[in-house]
C-alpha cells in the first residue's frame, strides 16, 4: 500500500523523489499508486506535488458477499477441499459481519478464513467431530481478527 510511505523518513524521501520524477519526466513517467481509498487520500493530500500532478483516479468496489463466497469455494477447491452447504452459509454470514470493518481485506481475508478453517477442520476431523476429511462444514468455519 502506497500510503505506508508516509510512516517513516525514508518513505517521505521516496515520495519527494517520485514527485520530482513526475515533474522531470512527465512525458515518459507513469506512476501507479494503490491502496485503500481513505489512506490514499491522506497520502495525496500530504504533499501539494501529488495534488497538482495526479490527474487520474480509479476506484474499485469491494467484492460482494456472493463473490467472496465463490472465491472461498474456488480457493478451497484448489487445495483439494469441498464446502458443505452449511459451511457455505456459515462463511457467507461471517463475511457479511466482517465486510464493512476497517481492515477487511477482500481476497486476503478469504484466504485467512480458509486457512484458519482448514486448521480447525483438521482438529475436528482428528476428534471425530467431522467425518469427511476433505469437506469443510459449518463447524470448521472460523476467523480470528488480529487485535492491535
Describe the function of each predicted region.
Residues 1-2, 33-39, 63:
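A short beta-strand-to-loop transition that corresponds to the Sensor-1 phosphate-sensing loop
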Residues 1-6, 19, 23:
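Catalytic acidic motif of RecA-like/P-loop NTPases
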Residues 2-12, 57-59:
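Flexible beta-alpha connector loops of hexameric P-loop NTPases
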Residues 14-29, 75:
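Substrate-engagement module of ASCE P-loop NTPases
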Residues 37, 86-89, 107-108, 114, ...:
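Conserved C-terminal helix/linker of AAA+ ATPases
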Residues 42-45, 60-103, 122-129:
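Conserved C-terminal "switch" segment of AAA+ ATPases
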